Amino acid sequence: MDKSKIQNPKSKIDNPVVFVGAGPGDPELITVKGQKALQESDLVIYAGSLVPKALLKWTKPGTKTISSASMHLDEIVKEMEAAYAEGKRVVRLHTGDPSLYGAIFEQMTALQERSIPYTVIPGVTAAFAAAAAMGIEYTLPEISQTLILTRMAGRTPVPQLENLASLAQHQTSMVIYLSISLVDEAAKILIDSYGADAACAVAYCVSQPDERIIFARLKDLAQTVKDEKITRTALIVVGKVLDIDHARLKHRSKLYQKGFEHGYRK
C-alpha cells in the first residue's frame, strides 16, 4: 500500500488541524491531550448531533465553536481552511474515537489536497464506556477472546461479508453501533446465531447524565427498546460475557495464576 495515500507527511508541522476524539460524552473522559488541544484552540468544529456541548467547557474564552450537524463536507473543510490560513488553531471534535464511524478519512483527504497539515488524537469509544458501566469484560478467558464492533446496513451499506448475519455466526462479544432504529431486524438476525435466550444489553447515552443500561434476552430486545422509547444514541451489546457474574466465574486468566511464568515473574 502506498502510505502517502493514508498518511499526512506534514502532520508534525506546527499548528496542524487537530482531529480530537471527544470520548463517549462525559467531559472528563476526553484524553489529557485532547483537552489540551481544546484549551489551545481558536476554532472548534464539533459534531453537534453527538458531541455534548459540555465538552466545550474546555475551550478558552473567545474560542469560536461551530456545530457541524447541519453542514456538509465542503462547508466543514472551508471553515477549517479559512481558519488555518489565518494562523488559527483548529480542532475538529468528533464523538468517541475519530477512527470509528467518524468519517474523518474524507476530511483528511480534503486537507491533504490543500496541503494543510493535520494530526489525530484518539478517544474512548462508547463500547468501552458501556463495558465500564455494565461492569463486564469483553474478553473473558475461555468464554470470548474476540470483540466485534459493527453496524447494520442502513443508508450506508456494509460489505457483504460483513453483514450482521455473517458476523453473528462467530458468537463472540459484539457491540453494534448506529443500529438501534433497526432493532427488530437486528434481534431476529442475532437470535439465529446466539439463541433467543442469549443475554444482551442496550447502552443509551453511556457516561452522560441520562445514561441508561438495560439488560434483556434477545427474544425481548426489540420490545424492550420500544418500551424504553430509545430511538438513537444507543449501542446493542450481545455475548456470553453478559451472562457471567462474579460468583460463577470459573475460567481465570493464566496471567495472574501463581504458577504462570513470564518475562516479569518466574
Model-predicted segments: where are they?
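Class I S-adenosyl-L-methionine
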Residues: 2, 12-124, 129, 222, ...
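A contiguous loop/helix-start segment that scaffolds small-molecule binding in enzyme catalytic cores
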Residues: 16-17, 75, 86-90, 146, ...
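Class I SAM-dependent methyltransferase SAM-binding "motif I" and its flanking Rossmann-like core
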Residues: 26, 97-170, 212-215
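Residue-level signal for well-ordered alpha-helical positions
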Residues: 57-58, 133-134, 189
